[in-house]
Amino acid sequence: MTPRPRETSDAEILAAAARVMQRVSPVDLTLADVAEEAGVHPATIIQRFGTKRELLLANCKAWTADVAGQFAEARAKYRSPLKTLIEHSVECTGFASTPESMANSLAYLQIDLTDPEFHAVLLAQYMTMRAETKKLLDHAVAARELKPCDTAALARLVQQVNAGAMLDWAVYRKGPLAAWTRRSVEALLAPYRSGRYRKSRWA
């Protein structure tokens, strides 16, 4: 008996949508584009998500729900709180590694800022990111990787520098975005580094 083909999961479809969103603006994106990327029939997208708006909203919600998990994975991978923060900041630039994908990202951001339902999800995402960043900074201070400081204020600055660095890079276009972001975050954190820096045992 021929085995039944494995059904494409919602998560796989949303991952396909995210890839298409890097290449195509919200005006030009179609459910057929996403279906082709996911290897499913367009009717499957309609059955699962309905309209293009609902698909984009589901993608936004899925990304937001995964923020804390992404930080946890980075902590397990890098151990050091300070290294975790820097490397995670760099890894988060992968969705917009070209000026064109950055432009598309900004186009989707307009929806996030003008549609109340999207904005509520975006705000939750940013609040979680800031809370997780503060947690890493608190651990970095405890591990003596950073000097004692106002970690809430510094977390806000880290978030702002991350966002600003990506837009700045899209204008100047010098080198890869990952390297540009790394330099920006490290420059922000440099004055806070402890003179007694040691390899952290924090986990």
Segments predicted by a language model, with ranges:
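Hydrophobic alpha-helical connector segments
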Residues: A58, G69-M102, L154-V158, R182, ...
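Helix-loop "lid/cap" segments that line or gate small-molecule binding pockets
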Residues: A74, V90-A96, N104-T114, A187-P191
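Helix-turn-helix
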Residues: E12, R19-E54, A58
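Generic hydrophobic, amphipathic alpha-helix propensity
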Residues: S9-A18, V34, N59-W63, V67, ...
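Residues in soluble alpha-helical coiled-coils and helical-bundle/repeat scaffolds
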Residues: G50-E54, A58, A76-S80, S97, ...
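Amphipathic alpha-helical packing segments from all-alpha helical-bundle domains
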Residues: A68, T98-L106, P116-A142, A153-R156, ...
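C-terminal peripheral helix-coil segments that are non-catalytic and often amphipathic
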Residues: I86-E87, E91, R130-H139, Q160-V161, ...
